[in-house]
Structure formats: structure tokens, C-alpha cells
């Protein structure tokens, strides 16, 4: 099970992190 998590986690971050930074920049633009 740990092997599956080790391979899935990087993929999850590659998909999740850009979405978070995209929303973050949108919120920052909205405040300014």
C-alpha cells in the first residue's frame, strides 16, 4: 500500500498544486 501512495502522491500534487496557486492568484487579483 505504501508503494501505491508513493507513486500516487507526486501525481496528485502535480494536479492539485497548480489549481491551488491558480485560485490563490485569482483571489489576490480580486483583492487588488
From Swiss-Prot:
> Keywords for this entry?
Toxin
A GO molecular function term, named singly, is: toxin activity
UniProt cross-references to InterPro entries, sorted A to Z: Amanitin/phalloidin
Please indicate which superkingdom the organism of origin belongs to. Eukaryota
For whether the record's keyword set contains Transmembrane, the answer is no
The keyword RNA-binding appears for this protein: no
Query: Could you say which protein family the record assigns here?
Result: Belongs to the MSDIN fungal toxin family.
- Position(s) of the covalent cross-link Cyclopeptide (Ile-Pro)? 11-18
> What does the entry's PTM section describe?
Processed by the macrocyclase-peptidase enzyme POPB to yield a toxic cyclic octapeptide. POPB first removes 10 residues from the N-terminus. Conformational trapping of the remaining peptide forces the enzyme to release this intermediate rather than proceed to macrocyclization. The enzyme rebinds the remaining peptide in a different conformation and catalyzes macrocyclization of the N-terminal 8 residues.
- Protein name, entry field: MSDIN-like toxin proprotein 1
- Which tissues does the record link to its expression? Expressed in basidiocarps.
Residue ranges the record assigns to the propeptide: 1-10, 19-32
Q: What does this protein do?
A: Probable toxin that belongs to the MSDIN-like toxin family responsible for a large number of food poisoning cases and deaths.
